[in-house]
């Protein structure tokens, strides 16, 4: 009866008797390709989100200790550009922030690296990333339009929330504030913990 079934279907007896599914998979190039793809995808799923060796943060320096509160002149601030000193500070709207944890953005190679160690207020308010837009002396920002001042206030709020406020930017001739070790600025309580 089996011979009659084979003759009725017109199939080769060797195809029906030996190998079955495995024989079909390994003799068809398309099936081999699909099997290889399935194995590759399974490997990726099992391997999961393990970072590749080049994606690791081994080249990142360890976090720096929290900077004590103090005030800065524009000249003193310039030292904290991520090159001369590993810490990166920026002034916005008269406030100085430690943006070291945002090194990828504000470090020497970052898209906002031009602002490191500088008063970034004018550049952020006017959306200008040119070094020429930044002043070397204290910038009173009195010539900003109301829209630019509002933009600057938005940046100020974002930095206050995200980064450690370490002091203020001093005008020429202004005396620095003496801060106690325990003193935290009033806006620190509203800021998210690091």
Curated annotation (Swiss-Prot):
Region of interest (Disordered), residue spans: 50-70, 172-194
Plastid recorded as keyword: no
Membrane-related topology note: Single-pass membrane protein
Keywords (A to Z) from UniProt: Endoplasmic reticulum, Iron, Lipid-binding, Membrane, Metal-binding, Microsome, Mitochondrion, Mitochondrion outer membrane, Phosphoprotein, Receptor, Secreted, Steroid-binding, Transmembrane, Transmembrane helix
Keyword Lipid biosynthesis assigned: no
Transmembrane segments: 25-43
Pfam families on file: Cyt-b5
Residues on Cytoplasmic side: 44-194
A Gene Ontology biological process term: positive regulation of protein localization to plasma membrane
Lumenal side: 2-24
Domain Cytochrome b5 heme-binding span(s) in chain numbering: 71-170
Residues that bind heme: 112
InterPro entries assigned: Cyt_B5-like_heme/steroid-bd, Cyt_B5-like_heme/steroid_sf, MAPR/NEUFC/NENF-like
Disulphide bridges, residue numbers: none
GO molecular function: heme binding; metal ion binding; protein homodimerization activity; steroid binding
Residues modified as Phosphoserine: 54, 56, 180
Positions bearing Phosphothreonine: 73
GO terms under cellular component: endomembrane system; endoplasmic reticulum; extracellular region; membrane; mitochondrial outer membrane; smooth endoplasmic reticulum membrane
UniProt-listed Gene3D superfamilies: Cytochrome b5-like heme/steroid binding domain
Record family assignment: Belongs to the cytochrome b5 family. MAPR subfamily.
Remarks, miscellaneous: Non-classical progesterone receptors involved in extranuclear signaling are classified in 2 groups: the class II progestin and adipoQ receptor (PAQR) family (also called mPRs) (PAQR5, PAQR6, PAQR7, PAQR8 and PAQR9) and the b5-like heme/steroid-binding protein family (also called MAPRs) (PGRMC1, PGRMC2, NENF and CYB5D2).
UniProt domain comment: The cytochrome b5 heme-binding domain lacks the conserved iron-binding His residues at positions 106 and 130.
Assembly: Homodimer. Forms stable homodimer through hydrophobic heme-heme stacking interactions. Interacts with FECH; the interaction results in decreased FECH activity. Interacts with EGFR, CYP1A1 and CYP3A4; the interactions require PGRMC1 homodimerization. Interacts with TMEM97 and LDLR; the interaction increases LDL internalization.
Purpose of the protein: Component of a progesterone-binding protein complex. Binds progesterone. Has many reported cellular functions (heme homeostasis, interaction with CYPs). Required for the maintenance of uterine histoarchitecture and normal female reproductive lifespan. Intracellular heme chaperone. Regulates heme synthesis via interactions with FECH and acts as a heme donor for at least some hemoproteins. Forms a ternary complex with TMEM97 receptor and low density lipid receptor/LDLR, which increases LDLR-mediated LDL lipoprotein internalization.
Protein name: Membrane-associated progesterone receptor component 1
Organism this protein belongs to: Sus scrofa
């Amino acid at each position: 009866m089996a011979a009659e079934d084979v003759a009725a279907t017109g199939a080769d007896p060797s195809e029906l008797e030996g190998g079955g599914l495995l024989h079909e998979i390994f003799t068809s190039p398309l099936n081999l390709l699909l099997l290889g793809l399935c194995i590759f995808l399974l490997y990726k799923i099992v391997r999961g989100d393990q970072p590749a060796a080049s994606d690791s943060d081994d080249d990142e320096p360890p976090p720096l200790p929290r900077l004590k509160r103090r005030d800065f002149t524009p000249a003193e601030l310039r030292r904290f550009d991520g090159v001369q000193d590993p810490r990166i500070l920026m002034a916005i709207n008269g406030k100085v922030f430690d943006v070291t944890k945002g090194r990828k953005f504000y470090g020497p190679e970052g898209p906002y690296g031009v602002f490191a160690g500088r008063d970034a207020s004018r550049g952020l308010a006017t959306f200008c990333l040119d070094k020429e837009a930044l002043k070397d002396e204290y910038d009173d920002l009195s010539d900003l339009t109301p829209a630019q001042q509002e933009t600057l206030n938005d940046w100020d709020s974002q930095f206050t929330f995200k980064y450690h406020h370490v002091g203020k930017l001093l005008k020429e001739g202004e005396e620095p504030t003496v801060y106690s070790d325990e003193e935290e600025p009033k806006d620190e309580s509203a800021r998210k913990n690091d």
